[in-house]
Amino acid sequence: MVLAVIPARGGSKGIPRKNVRLMNGKPLIYYAIHNAKNCPSIDDVVVSSDDEEILKIASSYGVETMTRDSELAKDAVTLDPVIYDAVCTMEKKKGIQYDVVITLQVTSPLLSSDTLDKALESFLASSDDTYISVVNKPHLSWTKKDGCYVPNYEKRLNRQQLPPNYLETGAFLITRRECMEVNSRIGKKVSVYEMPEREAVDIDAASDWVLCEYELKKKRIILRADGYKELGMGHIYHCLTLAYNLTGQEILFVTKEQHEPGLKKLQEANMPVHTIKSDEEFMEFVQEWKPDVVVNDCLNTEADYIKELKKYVKRVVTIEDLGEGADYADVVINALYEDHTRGDNYYWGSNYVCLRDEFFCATPSVFHEQVQNIVVIFGGTDPSNFTKRIYEMAKRIHKDYPEIKFHFALGVGYDQKANQIETDEIAGVYVEQNLKHISDLFGKADLAFTSQGRTVYELATIGVPAVVMAQNEREMKHTFAQMNNGFLNLGLGINVADETIETTFRWLVDTPQIRKEMQSLMMRHDLKSGIKRVIGLILEDEE
């Protein structure tokens, strides 16, 4: 038989009413009671307290309570006699003798029932007398001996190379009944049980309280996105931006293992990622991981897909979703489209643009009468290979515009070698792939060639007049990249003749007043507030 004893004195001075004060909407003592009741190996749970309010709240959660003698509630009294008294009282009441006794501290609300259950299982399978909960904190430390400071180590090493240094967390202590005495709960054969660092916080000060409450409010969020040549890398980059702005939440990317470009980019970004092979496998994983939110950045969804997902997760957010499934999502964020005929769960247009961090501190482009630098950027994979067409044009017209430099920013999924795109300084052509800080390149550009994806918002933020060609029919539905916002849109790129592209280029280079007006139209937009709105919608902080 296993007994869990939860000691909870009423006279907390550092944080008044600490044990019953609401922590993330529940009395602090709830978490210890919840863990004990959800541990299958624990037979009985008792709360020992000198405080009537604590006993009443504990009783409402369906556990045994006992009024602690006033002599055992004094400041100088240690836990040993308190726990011993509780065990003896329960044994007398139940007419039994317990085999194992667990002390559970109220001040460790981050301890999970899973960790407690595993610790107890390990203890029951061992020959140890006592388990003490610890966290491994290897650090270089010093002590004082004979009036001198001396190191607690033999050799200075990096923290990862130091030997284990186990600190007691106070979360729980498991011991065999025969090892218990009035003034001791620790037997001769002692072992430690290492618990996750996140769960090891012990509330002793107000700052500990704030940290625990923050951790308990943390949400588990899945970002579901793929990246490959035909689709492009925009969904991966967009979800990375979301992840960087969801600091403090528990984030996990989920992507299909067969789409290597997207997977590679996530790994390069050092993001936690789980791979799947199919939507069916994804649903199975969602049931296992139990997220609070799923953000689905995979274009159009089917109704059955979202309905199935909603069975396992409270909040489903879809991005750029024009499919039937969007009607069943909690939130649909379509920054690239506008269609206000659909439901109240849709959020449309540039108010919901998510700019990458680098664009919040980027310097706007300085306008020049004479074009000096042109940036060419067609996304992560450029499936229509517009890059090649502009590259050939740049070389062809160099004799007419020798002062102009073309800067090609190639995506990680673009095959530079196969397309023979390389730097040629004599022709004024400069090529870079997978740039880490694209805003620097935009900042010195006088003109840009781009497709009709999210890059148009980044160009608008910097104020770079741009010629736009859509990669596909879907991109043509994106509403922002039009002349009223500073873009010269040529439509579906595969239908645009090379002659038209060149004529457009020459006209813009030779008419600075048009470029200046385009820049002015771009700069009137405030695109930096969108990410805050989107994060609010994901976390359900804004509707």
Predicted regions and their residues:
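C-terminal alpha-helical cap of glycosyltransferases
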Residues: A205, L527-E543
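Conserved core of the sugar-phosphate nucleotidyltransferase
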Residues: P81, D85-A86, S108-P196
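Donor-nucleotide binding loops and adjacent catalytic segments primarily
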Residues: H259, Q372-A445
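Short phosphate-binding loop-to-helix
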Residues: E52-I102, L110-K118, K277-W289, N300-T301, ...
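A short, well-ordered alpha-helix in the C-terminal region of glycosyltransferases
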Residues: W507, Q513-K528
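A nucleotide-sugar donor-handling region in carbohydrate enzymes
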Residues: I186-D204, D208-L211, Y328-N385, Q416
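Acidic donor-binding loop of glycosyltransferase active sites
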Residues: G443-R454, V464
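Active-site and donor-binding regions of nucleotide-sugar-utilizing enzymes
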Residues: I83, Y228-E230, H238, Y244-N245, ...
